[in-house]
Amino acid sequence: SPLHHDERGYFVENWRKMDLLQYGVPELFFQGKLQNNVSVSKKGTIRGMHCQGWAKLMTVASGTFRMCFIDLRLSSPSYKAVDVIDVVPGMAIFVPAGVSNGAQALTDKGILNYLVTGYYDPNAKHAGIMPLDKTLNLPWDLSGEVIISSKDQKSDSYLSIVKKIESTRKKIAVIGYTGVIGSKVFEQLHSFKQYEVDGFNRDNLSELLQQEYDCVICTAPSSEKFKTNIGLANPVEEIEILVDTIAKVKAMQFVLVSSQTALHSENRYGQVQNEVCQAVLQHHSNHSIYFMDTLYGENLKKGLIHDLLHQ
């Protein structure tokens, strides 16, 4: 917002909802505001790097502040990205929940406003990173006296905070990860940083039982319907191993991508799909099963046409 100067000083519209919405601040933020805080800081003072878990709208009433930000949201495409900006009156900075933030007063008696969605509690224990962390090496102004509270000086290191965050990743296993559907699921899951994804097929399926998973996604057995019906795919031994593994694997949630053929077991392919489906129903109370019709993937790698063309 522009500053309106006169002989008394200046006036500024600190923030306007319609402007902030235009620049990406979510509507929900304005419904959840609980408190406005003001800090007055001596030159050189660093407050941070805080991560209280709530959103903030930060504006400067007087002076200049160097603000540093680290995105600690596992699900964010900018996870672990660092941003630095010198903020003066007339600028508004929206900090999403999960983004660690800190500010250094570059001028004396700097005044900073915080509009927040959480109540202040001096005894609360929130995550924080020591602002002078050597790994981060943030570009604070260290040319003069630097003032940091004892609480902020005792904050965790950047690497220890990252380790804690990444230990919360959900562990997911994809059975059939080299198949047409499985490979796409595996590829997409790998693009999300909040997931730790392992892939299994007939070559390493036994290793699935060595760990516990938050979720197991099964896209097996092979979708080669024609070959299965004439005995050239999905042999009995492989299906027995798959069914046994499904029964024994430890998972909080089990997702099966099956075929509508499982509902009609008059041929071998339907029987195979039904066996796998029954194993899921019997051994995993928290399950989801998706019955899909015959699909044709990239280069016709699925379905009857592919089977006929590649005999």
PLM regions: where:
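Non-catalytic, conserved peripheral segments adjacent to functional cores
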Residues: 1-87, 107-109, 116-169
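Short beta-strand His + acidic residue motifs that chelate non-heme Fe in jelly-roll/DSBH
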Residues: 101-106
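N-terminal Rossmann NAD(P)H-binding glycine-rich loop of SDR-like oxidoreductase domains
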Residues: 170-195
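Conserved Rossmann-fold NAD(P)-dependent oxidoreductase catalytic core, especially the SDR/UDP-sugar
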Residues: 241-271, 288-293
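NAD(P)-dependent short-chain dehydrogenase/reductase
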Residues: 270, 274, 278-311
